[in-house]
Amino acid sequence: LTPAGAIDGSEIDARVCDCCQTDVAVSGAALLVVYRNRSEDDTRDIQAARLENGAWTVPVTVHADEWRIDACPVNGPAVAARDDDVAVAWFTAPDQPRVRLAFSADGGRTFGPPLEVASGRVIGRVDVVLLQDGHAVVSWLAATANGAVIRAQPFNRAGAADVARDVATANVARSSGFPQMVQVAG
């Protein structure tokens, strides 16, 4: 979107999963977009692309989960950035439902190995914020005996920095939306 209101549309990837939300963050002097890709065999891994000097980079895979599903999971990734430090959180289910987190120290050009945030009774609908101290706080929807809760947990590059905490009860229906975190300070 230009200051004059013109929209310059560009196709980043022709195989973006149509129903999963995308997310965007500013990393240094570039925009970083994350999304769920959809290969010819319906493998739905998370990809990242940067808008640098007016052109989109070739997308990179955040992690090859190799989740194959012949339907849209309606469960896209989340990204947060501070300069070249980037955190991406996502839901995946190649063998069981999981929430994962990966860090990048080069603005999303490459990503480290994923950290396991949660597994088992997770629904997904993730969000992430990146704090000044480098910790990423991940939130997700988890199934309970009585419905669902929104959970949040801080992580550093080595793993969990504290325990997961239930933030609020929630409805499991898709119509309840996707919980979002807002960083107020720090």
Question: Where do the protein language model's features map onto the residues?
Answer:
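Extracellular, repeat-based ectodomains that mediate carbohydrate processing or recognition
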Residues: 1-186
